UniProtKB/Swiss-Prot annotation:
Keywords: ATP-binding, DNA damage, DNA repair, DNA-binding, Nucleotide-binding. It comes from the Bacteria. Belongs to the DNA mismatch repair MutS family. GO terms for biological process: mismatch repair. It comes from Rhodopirellula baltica (strain DSM 10527 / NCIMB 13988 / SH1). InterPro entries: DNA_mismatch_repair_MutS, DNA_mismatch_repair_MutS-lik_N, DNA_mismatch_repair_MutS/MSH, DNA_mismatch_repair_MutS_C, DNA_mismatch_repair_MutS_clamp, DNA_mismatch_repair_MutS_core, DNA_mismatch_repair_MutS_N, DNA_mismatch_repair_MutS_sf. The lineage of its organism: Bacteria, Pseudomonadati, Planctomycetota, Planctomycetia, Pirellulales. GO terms for cellular component: cytosol. One of its GO terms (molecular function) is damaged DNA binding. CDD domains: ABC_MutS1. ATP binds at residues 632-639. This is DNA mismatch repair protein MutS. Transmembrane segments: none annotated. Disulfide bonds: none annotated.
Amino acid sequence: MTPMMRQYHEAKEACGDALLFFRMGDFYELFLDDAKVAAGILGLTLTSRDKDSENPTAMAGFPHHQLDQYLQKLIRAGFRAAVCEQVEDPKAAKGLVRREITRVVSAGTLTDEGLLDPKEPNYLAAVFAPSQKAREKAQKEAAKTNDPSGGDVVGIAWAELSSGRFEAGVFPRARLDDELARIGPAEVLHCEDDASVHPDPTATWSWTARPAWSYAAADAEKSLCKQLSVANLEGLGFEDNGDVAIRAAGAVLCYLKETQRGSLDHFRSLTCHNRSPVLQIDAATRRSLEITRTMRTGSREGALLGVIDRTVTPMGSRMLADHLAAPLIDADAITYRTDAVDEFVRNNNLRSDIRTVLGDTYDLTRLLARVATGRTGPRDLRQIAVTLSGLPALKARLAERDSACLTRLESELHLCPELREQLESALNDECPLSAADGNFIREGFDSELDTLRELARGGKRWIAEYQQRQMDETGIANLKVGYNRVFGYYLEVSNAHKDKIPADFIRKQTLKNCERYITPELKEYEEKVLAADEKASSREQMLFTLLRENTHKHLAILQEVANAIAMTDVVASLAEVAAQHHWVRPTLTDDSVLRIEGGRHPVLDVTMAQGEFVPNDCIQSPETGMILLITGPNMAGKSTYIRQVALITLLAQTGSFVPATSAEIGIADRIFARVGASDELSRGQSTFMVEMVETARILNTATSRSLVILDEIGRGTSTYDGLSLAWAITEHLHEQIGARTLFATHYHELAALQETLPRVANLSVAVKEWQDEVVFLHRIVPGSADKSYGIQVARLAGIPVEVNERAKDVLAQLEADHRDSLDRPTIAPPSGVNGKGSGDTYQLTLFGYADHPLIQEIETVDIDSMSPIQAWQFLQEAKAKLSAGPKAVKG
């Protein structure tokens, strides 16, 4: 085995299951099984070393500048990659170049700009569940204190390497999936020994099993204290069951240190999520309401986030997504945000000026993360300088504002004048990504560098003049001076002119069509030029290191600046939407009243032409009705109406204005939406089972302060079963929970509940019939609907005319209530079709035989008390009744 392959195997052993990208000169190479895997995933050519040997070594590679491109493909395919770099200059190396693994890249540990979506956060999360013994103990304690979690909790921590954000919290185990859906991590760590956490293979994030020692309590606390520079963790707010959150946070930090092999100085605080309660939204509701992603395509476009995101900075866009994923439930905190939005709505010029300034800033959050982890380059530092240059104008426009939020943001925009001046004077306007590319320090910044550069440039001019002089003296017109790393500078002469070579030319290399020479004079100047070049490069690298270190010293204050820029952008974005689309400021209350006048669906309000969307009111109170039963035909707008109420509530609690003419909203603690039909085939659950599971969660966890949205509950089973369930669910919500509820249903029978339940009110969607056509008015009116108009909707959907006409015929026969001898509805076959049964009719058994009067008579007869003759007579009578039809039976 060669020394290089021995070095490779040592690195491979250290990186575990990650594919190893091994730097060799200008290429990254993969060997053995890694090469075979990568060739298939990345489309690389699979070749081999030592092809003539008995066991050639499989290999594949790519140019070093394509690293980001191939890392991205690999991560998307679910793999991890270890990057092994050359950590010394090959020219200075004595023997084998020293190499080290500088980082391990996984879905949750991306920092490079080319690997990240600028508008999306990229979280690494960890889950920790206590042991069975600890769980049982906690459950006993919870029983004594009436803890709603029952003591069955998990710790979840999440961090973003590209920003330094770090949070953790304690959550009921039942909410694990919901919380992960809220966070939206790219990768989730779980303890390989914990059988109680079941990684969901259908999740949008990847799962990584970690050893139990990485969750050790003592190590977690020690590591976190050191990282955060605190003596203990008591001041962070992790109290009841807080150890599970601490252990999850420790696992995150352990993984980051293991994979990054460098500084994590931008992780300066750990936020206790439980200190700031937020509106609870389960995973199903997030999907149903399409808050951040559409259900059909999974994209931002068409979702609520997509239409309200008018941010002009990447960090503002990410913060807005965070706010929308976790709306507030504290009235003061909501008002704090809304006041700032209000001030921007009222001042168009101010808002426009601020958005213009923000548009010239770069992604400071992620730039600082690369500074902290030691992966920054000259272009990053230049972009930090440009961002700092815009701060004075931004700070001036935020000065002396009425809003407490804007006042605080102005105070957090630290100008850092010394750092800004240094970076601006040091760096060229156009800088390379990597410091190794050189030529990024501005002329005049460093006199020593300027001298070395001038010397190098002067030497190169001399070489050009020397070439011309040799051409003139020798008469060789095509003589040229060249350079390579082996021979340095040389004179190249074609074979046709070899006879003209002067005596002082020393031959160094013979090629097919030419020969290469050196001269003492040429070598002397070469040493001067190369020495000046190398010294200039070394000086420039040293200056870059100083700039990077000085920027690193400002890390904490610059992170505060980045957050202030992002929040300013979020507030201005919400104000921009409100001003453009005439949204209004909602009034937030702590009671259960919901009063929306002229409400509009926020997505449709923005995407449809102005005036096209039909606004509707929604009033919920103990006096007018807390449960609104909405009936009406499909396509009339029932689902849109109930969704818009939920989204308006969510926007209000985010701190946004809302699409309405006025809105008074009692703050909700939870929003539930059981909307739409979908199955979970991968989990073995039918559409109806999914519907019932989601409904059960609502009934078990909703409170009187919750907002519940139900759409067509019970349609996945038989008519009577579905109606019975819908009826009982409505009663339970009314009697046991008292939550504000909007229930869109096709069961018109539910309208009768208004007569018996005082807080139930009927609404319907207005339609107009004209010449066998149905016109949907999309207007919500009091009262229940009396028709479903399903056949008309089917025609609008493109159902063939003959099918539609046959449906009308069948409907007419069903409404006429024709029945056979067993009391089953009968349908005559279409003309030209011969029936199979007696009387050429179809018998429908929608409700089974159990309701037939003859069956009921047989069930009640006492056979044991009958004589054989009496039994025979009963049978004869039953047969006669059966032949005579249902009326004879009833008579």
